[in-house]
Amino acid sequence: MRNPQLNKHGELQHLLTIDGLPRSILTAILDTAAPFTEVAEREVKKLPLLRGKSIFNLFFENSTRTRTTFEIAAKRLSADVVNLNVSTSSAAKGESLLDTVDNLSAMQADMFVVRHAASGAPFLIAQHLFATGRDHIHVVNAGDGRHAHPTQGLLDMYTIRHFKRDFTNLTIAIVGDVLHSRVARSQIGALTTLGVPEVRVIGPKTLLPTDVERLGVRVFHDIREGLRGVDVVMMLRLQNERMNGALLPTPQEFYKVWGLTAEKLALAKPDAIVMHPGPMNRGVEIDSSVADGAQAVILPQVTFGIAVRMAVMSMLAGQQGSK
């Protein structure tokens, strides 16, 4: 079966999900991102790799970090960036997603960066472009429903590699609302592909998928037991906007039992790092003393996110787009 993310040469054509991508491609993205971190330290933070390319950010869900870092990344690569304001676009008047894509394609788009509440929306766009002979336009998934958030997963891998160097001797814990988290799915897929020997998932039963163990993770409902001896703690926020009346803990109950405090973090290795994809709910999934503490690498995640998104866009449109 054709992998819709790869072209006929096996090169990355779209980034829709981490699932199905070989370790070589994930490693290539991380390796490509490394020199881009240095661009931020320059007086002139510009490279000409995407000069003349038009990138459309189609965000049908709210976003701060993801949308902003995609825009910064594209501009640092010298691309022309168009941000679609969904609330004032024709989508608000009932225009279908694919009609929107068709019209923007007619404006000579080179790439769509898509965030959508519907799982599979970026796949639908990529398939439509292929079926209509416009698969030279690249699609990047910036988060689709509960399904996937591949660039977040990749920037998390870059952060781990930066601070821990080697994936193959780590124990990593993912804590919180895994059930509703597209980030967790991308994290688990990337960690497994990159050779992490033990991935732990920690949370209440009502916030974990019933089949989560088939992903090759160890499940813990006791956070203290789950954090014992880990190298990396990856926190997730409660996805209140995706919950539909399930038997769920209140924010106060969640914090008391599963919130990451300094006392709980002390059970991890002394040099463990703490990560969070944002936005953080302080006093719910993480205590401020931990979020602002010496072991937190939450702000470096944001910084590295720009470099990783530069890497993805340059690999898509900068190199292969001209073939």
Swiss-Prot record:
The gene is pyrB. It comes from the Bacteria. GO terms for molecular function: amino acid binding; aspartate carbamoyltransferase activity. This is Aspartate carbamoyltransferase catalytic subunit. Its EC number is 2.1.3.2. Coiled coil: none annotated. It catalyses: carbamoyl phosphate + L-aspartate = N-carbamoyl-L-aspartate + phosphate + H(+). It comes from Aromatoleum aromaticum (strain DSM 19018 / LMG 30748 / EbN1) (Azoarcus sp. (strain EbN1)). One of its GO terms (cellular component) is cytosol. Catalyzes the condensation of carbamoyl phosphate and aspartate to form carbamoyl aspartate and inorganic phosphate, the committed step in the de novo pyrimidine nucleotide biosynthesis pathway.
